[in-house]
Amino acid sequence: MGEPAFTSFPSPPVLGKLKRNMMPWALQKKREIHMAKAHRRRAARSALPMRLTSCIFRRPVTRIRSHPDNQVRRRKGDEHLEKPQQLCAYRRLQALQPCSSQGEGSSPLHLESVLSILAPGTAGESLDRAGAERVRSPLEPTPGRFPAVAGGPTPGMGCQLPPPLSGQLVTPADIRRQARRVKKARERLAKALQADRLARQAEMLTCR
């Protein structure tokens, strides 16, 4: 008997490297857009973020690194910039100055009307008291006011603000009495806090 004959099958043809992309055009376009967005995000993360504060000039945030050459990165033009003034606050302060609509200084009558608005019933009394004190000797000190400086009249002498509501003087005995009251109040507060702390500790022990 002879040896069995081996049947040889033809090998498939070699196709070689494909030259055409098998992805659909729409999917390929979406992939390119996604890769471009990812590249832009990586580029944005590599740059220093900008500090957005109340300052009108943006400055990059300083990243802390462990090397001696760490410096605040900024533009060269920022070196000569002056600190911006708060114009709104400056205008508010200017509006508080006692002056008339023409820009002139306000008279005692204008100030009297302002004081009557702020504290009704006290402006007239203060001005009457100022007029009565003007009759006295200029060297005689009056309670609640500083004596006039020698060499000329004090500006705004007739525009005295109303005195405080309590006209009595504070004596050292009043100060010592108030200090004793404060000390007693603090002692009562310390005792109350200690009792509360002990009660909380006892409650925690009973809950366990």
UniProtKB/Swiss-Prot annotation:
Signal peptide start-end: none
BP-aspect Gene Ontology terms: DNA methylation-dependent constitutive heterochromatin formation; negative regulation of transcription by RNA polymerase II
GO cellular component, one term: nucleus
Keywords: Repressor, Transcription, Transcription regulation
Origin: domain of life: Eukaryota
GO molecular function: methyl-CpG binding
Keyword Transcription regulation: yes
Record InterPro entries: MBD2/MBD3_p55-bd (IPR032343), MeCpG-bd_2/3_C_dom (IPR025884)
Database matches in Pfam families: MBD_C, MBDa
Family: Belongs to the MBD3L family.
Miscellaneous remark of the record: The MBD3L proteins are encoded by strongly repeated regions of the 19p13 chromosome. The exact number of functional copies is unclear, and some of them may represent pseudogenes.
Protein name: Methyl-CpG-binding domain protein 3-like 3
Organism: Homo sapiens (Human)
